[in-house]
Amino acid sequence: MCLAAIVAACTSKPVEQTWVKVEGNKFIAPDGSELVFRGLCFSDPVKLVGEGQWTERYFAEAADWGANVVRFAVHPANINAMGWDATFEAMDQGIEWAKQHGMYVIMDWHSIGNLKDAKYTNPMYNTTLEETFKFWRTVAQRYKDEPTVALYELFNEPTVTGPDTGTCTWDEWKGIQEQIIDTVRTYNPNAVCLCAGFNWAYDLTPVAVAPIERENVAYVSHPYPMKREQPWEEQWEADFGFVADKYPVICTEIGFCLENELGAHIPVISTDVY
């Protein structure tokens, strides 16, 4: 919480690992040690470019906070508005800044809804299976030699319980994620793929009986405070925490707002008890 090796001929020295990888329920750093990711989810790169905030200073501040990973939340509407070439050029620069400050990058296809039925909770998240595969082909090809882009978050928040979000079973969603992973692996066999469950990437209970059948994967949860009533801990364990007994789990979104704060909305409203 990825695997690449260069085999040198005629040598008995250990092979150098340059990528983060999954071993059991842990993320393993290139030096072989366990890696715990602590980081920040950035705003969409296109949004930050437009606001003049996609700068080295922004990344330096994240590193000063103690982050060892940052998340690029790429909204389908934004990449299409700015253009794919310009967006990826901006992300190229961001990756260099992350590397400069000793941080990894999570590449996140930031949609919310039902990819199978192409039903989404807001027009900014509208995409298609074809476009989603295109995005991950582009990422995997462009960054196949860039270990800094260590984690590929395949789909931000799948849900079929929002208004007009269609239907999708776990088996169907599992199959789609496995197809995306296979596409990634065609171009980059090394990146760790992050897989989410339903209920806006909160619920991982189906993993107990039907895990993703691919190697070098980890799971995502977004345990915002209003997903469950207090006390949270036992419910978190039942809903997603148990997965960490066998596989790495990373919370790529987590946090809260006070009820009267700017940005407060369901499901993030809580107090500092959270």
Where do the PLM segments sit?
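Aromatic-lined substrate-binding rim segments of carbohydrate-active enzymes
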Residues: W54-K116, E131-F133, W173-N188, A264-Y274
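N-terminal carbohydrate-binding accessory modules
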Residues: C10-V69
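Residues embedded in well-ordered beta-strands within globular domains across many folds
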Residues: G39-C41, R71, E153, L194
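Short glycine-enriched, charge-decorated loop/helix-capping segments at active-site entrances
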Residues: W84-D85, T121-N126, T167-T169
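Active-site-adjacent "subsite" loops/lids of carbohydrate-active enzymes
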Residues: D117-T138
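Feature marks short, surface-exposed loop/turn motifs that line or immediately flank catalytic pockets
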Residues: D44-V46, A73-N80, G113-L115, P158, ...
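Bacterial N-terminal signal peptides
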Residues: M1-I6
